[in-house]
Amino acid sequence: MSNFETVLNALPDTINSEQEAAKLLTQFQPLRNMSFELKPDTIIFCDSKDLNTALEFYKGQEHCIRAFHVLGLKEEIKNKNVKIVPFTTFTKEDNIHCFFLPDLRPACTAYRNLSIALSKLNIQEYTIEAKSASKFYRRNSFIFINNMLQTAIDNYNALEDNLSRYTYLSLWKSRHLCNPNYIPIVPYDQYWHPLASAKENDLVCEGGPANGITTIDFCKKLRNKCDIIAFEPDPVYYTNAAATCKDYQNIRLIPKGLYDFTGTLYINTDNYVKVVKQKIKEEDFECSVTSIDDYFLNAKYDKVDFIKMDIEGAELNALMGAKQILQRDKPNLAICIYHNCIDFITIPEFLRKLDLGYKFYTGHHRPWYAETVIYATAR
């Protein structure tokens, strides 16, 4: 049994003290480690677009490599030095080593795809080519606040299952050590927790459709048996989302952001796009915002069934502006808790203290800090 499985299976339902939490955290080991050297019988796992680079990179080390498993490859490639096959499956006993080309952005598509493919096989532990990851991880750093441990413990005690509990504690440790490799990647799609997702015939409130890809995904997975109200304040994203969603009659795009009041704020684009109360630089521009309560109560919708938020750090404010809808309808929730460094503490705390009978789960969907979601259901 792996360290991950051993710790996962032994987690307590509740933690009673900061000392107990600290002791538990010592048991958590990195799930993904950077490595410069190949072990015997290694399987190189890479994306098809990176295959030629990987073959050149590992030239002369073929004696350590059992095979190249390639994501996106349709048929086996004959090679006199090493076996090259399409990715099909791995076992937890395999010595898997991920190779990808480093990306200057905080998100790396190839690495994301490799890690998600492994997570869907319930494989959390593998190595990463150090030269792939070193540039990538050097860009990650988070301010960390140590005096919130008791609140984090209270959030942990409200979670429903061990995978959520493990994920939550690993978030704490990863931010403390500035190393996201402690966080497991859950085996279900983002926003689609098996017990807290949108259902057919739901009215979906989507905060942050961006280019409309997630909006279309809701429609496809719900077989178009849903109505979606999507709020996007950025005019470029709004235009792109409108083009993406133009053939869907059940999608309504609103050119506003979600916040705790109805009025005007500013969009700041220094790093990630985010909504701010005051202009930070000359290029910042005004945007309209509304609260979920103001919009849905005034529009006289009978019920909001599901709320998804990925709104660049405005999630807590938007939830504060949704108290009446949360109390009236108790919609299923999928709320991002990673944009601000303490969102993973403050947002679960806010939802927990509403005391609406929600069951809570946490899911992490990428091999870095981003894309952590708290899921909730009161159904």
Predicted regions and their residues:
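Phosphate/nucleotide-binding beta-alpha loop and adjacent structural elements of enzyme active sites
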Residues: 1-67, 71-379
